[in-house]
Amino acid sequence: MAFTSPLSTWSLGQQFGLALVISALALVSVIIYGCFLHPLRHIPGPFLAKFSPLWIMRALHRMRFNSELQALHQQYGNVVRIGPNEVSFASLEAETAIYAKQEDGRFSKAGTFLTLFSDLVLNAPTLITIPDPILHRKLHKVIQQAFTPQALARQEPIQKLHIDMAMSELEELAKSGGTVDIADTLETMFWEIIGDLAFGEPLMSGKRPTYESLKQLGKSTMPMVEALSFFLTLPGIASVFGIARSLITALPFPSQLSKLVPSSKLRDCAERQDGREDFLTAIMGSEKQDLVLDADAFFSNAMGLTLAGYQTTATTLAATFYHILRYPEAYNRVCFEIRSTFVSDEEITGARLGRLPFLNACIRETLRLLPPANGKTAQRTASSCTIDGVHIPAGTTVSADLYTIQRSPKYFADPAAFRPERWLDVAEDSEFKRDNRAAYRPFLIGSRACIGREMAQQSIRLIFGNLLWKYDFQQLDQDGFVWERDAGSSLIYTDYKVMVHVMKASGRS
């Protein structure tokens, strides 16, 4: 006698009702486990974060990750659970514990959001995402050759060449009294610079619009990647990764990325290298450390370094310009410092700009307010440990929220305001005398700190030095765009504009 399921006698409505009941019971079970039984149940945080990735997905979708995470820390304190298996810290002690000793095996890049995103978009791990500390140390050692003081000195003429070329547009605007989005101008300028520094020739020249379209596409996929990273932590779900890769590969992102620098052109470029210490020749030196990089790893590292370096530096350029234009006293002071130091633009060098106290104070203050390495890029996977007095189970994703730390009244006076004078020598009675400068770590610390930070700061100084020596700028409609209110933040900053009126500086021909 054949077995007949009782469900076969049920109506479609009854079967649907049963499915709803089972789903509801499963959801209640997940909520109960996340809130009352999970190893992280002792850590406070929003209700949704206790059992789902929905809080993070919403913050990424709204493009308000930094400000909303800061609000959580203000509500719950220095330790906040922002996902079922994710904890954010907002203290200097936690930041030091997580990032200072990367090679001891306690904190890994494996399984983090950035590593997953990179794995889905690129075909091989990069210096930025590679989990293995030994391989990372070897790769870091060879790529570091592109960022030594000697290499930076040899790169300066290339930076100056592209700055001079880009200033022709500003020259025409200054003559006609025109207006421009200076953020867009600065980013285009640096795109050409880093493309040349990376590959030994302007291999990406004119392709910034392609990248910008990719950035918008990437912005829309962030919540989906967050959901995927959550599901991959569940038992038996790892096989989904291959399916997810296939689905995301079907999107325009990977194919468009290859259009920025086709692999065939990259190989041609590598064969034409003339000994310049750029990103490409540094990566080619990997064999000196017994590292053999296949074509995918070669391409992924070249593109990963270039795009990461471009986006963080371009944002800092735009944000620094934005801040000094909003504060006339700061703008006038930095212009006076530059114009009184250099008689002609030929005297402007990276070394001399590095000695200008107020210019560098403006850059540092911008990096304090808007650290480029913040958000999901700073995640690590922890072993069983104690961070800032809180027990963290093995496998927990942890990060220190630089945005909140560097805006904390615990470490800085008047923390939300742009006050570059805090970085100058301060008097005993100064309100900034008690600032804890050790809490300023915009490029992170330890072996995973940004490898290109000196190159980035040299480019920023050269661009500002040349532009402010020759031109005056006036921001239009200051209330039309407010960075904290209008710029998007997730993995990167997006959707910012700085509209200015361009004029020749007094006495400049």
UniProtKB/Swiss-Prot annotation:
The keyword Isomerase does not apply. Fusaproliferin shows cytotoxicity against pancreatic cancer cell lines and provides a new chemical scaffold that can be further developed to obtain more potent synthetic agents against pancreatic cancer. Fusaproliferin and its analogs show also anti-inflammatory activity and can be hit compounds for the treatment of inflammation-associated diseases. It holds the Pfam family p450. Its main location: membrane. Its EC number is 1.-.-.-. InterPro entries: Cyt_P450 (IPR001128), Cyt_P450_E_grp-I (IPR002401), Cyt_P450_sf (IPR036396), Cytochrome_P450_monoxygenase (IPR050121). It is found in: Membrane. Heme binds at residue 450. Keywords: Heme, Iron, Membrane, Metal-binding, Monooxygenase, Oxidoreductase, Transmembrane, Transmembrane helix. It is an enzyme of class 1 (oxidoreductase). The chain crosses the membrane at residues 16-36, 224-244. It is a multi-pass membrane protein. Pathway: Secondary metabolite biosynthesis. Its cofactor is heme. GO terms for cellular component: membrane. One of its GO terms (molecular function) is iron ion binding. Belongs to the cytochrome P450 family. Cytochrome P450 monooxygenase; part of the gene cluster that mediates the biosynthesis of the mycotoxin fusaproliferin (FUP) that belongs to the class of bicyclic sesterterpenoids. PANTHER family: CYTOCHROME P450, P450, PUTATIVE (EUROFUNG)-RELATED. This is Cytochrome P450 monooxygenase FUP2.
